[in-house]
């Protein structure tokens, strides 16, 4: 008996994350990509823009009703913030059974949506068909802070540096290589959306200062944590090892991880664990690829989880 593949479509596929999603879907034995929506690339063959895809599918320019009419089993929205609502409304009205995964910030504060950071939230998944993917910076911050969450004596201070792919493909200062050359560009130094996201998810205030760097992909998150009681470096290291012992995408390392080593890989490295005198302050460093674990890989984990498959299918 032949098992029918699960059909999937992507809305907003021109961006860097869309390209990574196409590669992961092409590698998935149980998924069939049935539409890819992009106004800018409409009419062009997907295979010309994605190394991993070999079919004849072409990009289409689809509005919300047209996406709903495709009746795909799964739809991933890879749109800029603020653009998801019409597509969600159309799918809610016409295909409520569709599994919908939104990569924007639009539904991360909506309690009706499952917030999908599997290493921290998979135990709360209860069959929701609406999944909000966490932000890239927010993923790094939460994974770096959580093992010491109950020991915090004050707000974590998080200094984040991202490659310019995190600024998307729409031209701006933050993804202009000429402006970024020999430069580090701070922005949104208070009240960044990922600061609010992490504060809400962890239930503690978090202070976040993002920066864009000249490299293309990868995030370095340096987190300063004040502790209620002194802990040794060995105790802290052991807490992280224990918390993530069964998480194959999270590697605890001794030295501070380098972003150059994580770019293009699916997981997260956490390390550095440097104590201040008195052992009530520790600095932890996390690195991840913003396009993969910060976006596409995490979406695939959430998809696999929701459909009852091995969480790492197509991820490796």
Swiss-Prot record:
Active site residues according to the UniProt entry: 136
Pfam families in alphabetical order: Semialdhyde_dh (PF01118), Semialdhyde_dhC_1 (PF22698)
Signal peptide location: none
Enzyme class, broadest EC rank: oxidoreductase
Keywords of this entry: Amino-acid biosynthesis, Arginine biosynthesis, Cytoplasm, NADP, Oxidoreductase
E.C. numbers: 1.2.1.38
Gene3D superfamilies assigned to the protein according to its UniProt record, in alphabetical order: Dihydrodipicolinate Reductase, domain 2, NAD(P)-binding Rossmann-like Domain
Protein name in UniProt: N-acetyl-gamma-glutamyl-phosphate reductase
Provenance organism: Xanthomonas campestris pv. campestris (strain 8004)
